[in-house]
């Protein structure tokens, strides 16, 4: 019986270590910083969506670097968050559709 208790504890410990390493791998799998992918996150408010506005275009503000964005008030360090002009096209009020009851 003593052997089974030790093996169950060992198995649980190994499973927890495995989960820990998977979490670490997922946390740091963002890729290299020098890749050419430009990810821009834009926050569009819920009110804009409910008013029927749609995202029309994104334009970077003052792109001065060939491989990225650099602004006059910043040094040459890597810019993580990039500002963009967001142009919303207004399609008018959304029409209210009453729920369909079966």
UniProtKB/Swiss-Prot annotation:
Region (Disordered): 56-78
Gene knockout outcome: Shorter root hairs.
Tissue specificity comment: Expressed in roots and sepals.
Paired cysteines (S-S): none
One BP annotation, GO: positive regulation of cell population proliferation
Endpoints of the signal sequence: 1-27
Residues excised as propeptide: 28-89
One GO cellular component term noted in the UniProt record for this chain: extracellular space
Source taxon at top rank: Eukaryota
Keyword terms, alphabetized: Differentiation, Growth factor, Hydroxylation, Secreted, Signal, Sulfation
Record PTM Hydroxyproline, positions in chain: 99
Residues modified as Sulfotyrosine: 91
Molecular-function GO terms, alphabetical: growth factor activity
Misc. comment: 'Golven' means irregular waves in Dutch.
Record family assignment: Belongs to the RGF family.
Protein name (record): Protein GOLVEN 4
């Amino acid at each position: 019986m003593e052997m089974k208790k030790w093996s169950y504890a060992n198995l649980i410990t190994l499973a927890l270590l495995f989960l820990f390493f998977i979490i670490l791998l997922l946390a740091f799998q963002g890729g290299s910083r020098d890749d050419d992918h430009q990810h821009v996150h834009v926050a569009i408010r819920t009110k804009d969506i409910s008013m029927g506005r749609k995202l029309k275009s994104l334009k970077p503000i003052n792109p001065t670097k060939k491989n990225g964005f650099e602004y006059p008030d910043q040094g040459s360090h890597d810019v993580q968050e990039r500002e963009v002009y967001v142009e919303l096209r207004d399609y008018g009020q959304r029409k209210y559709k009453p729920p369909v009851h079966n």
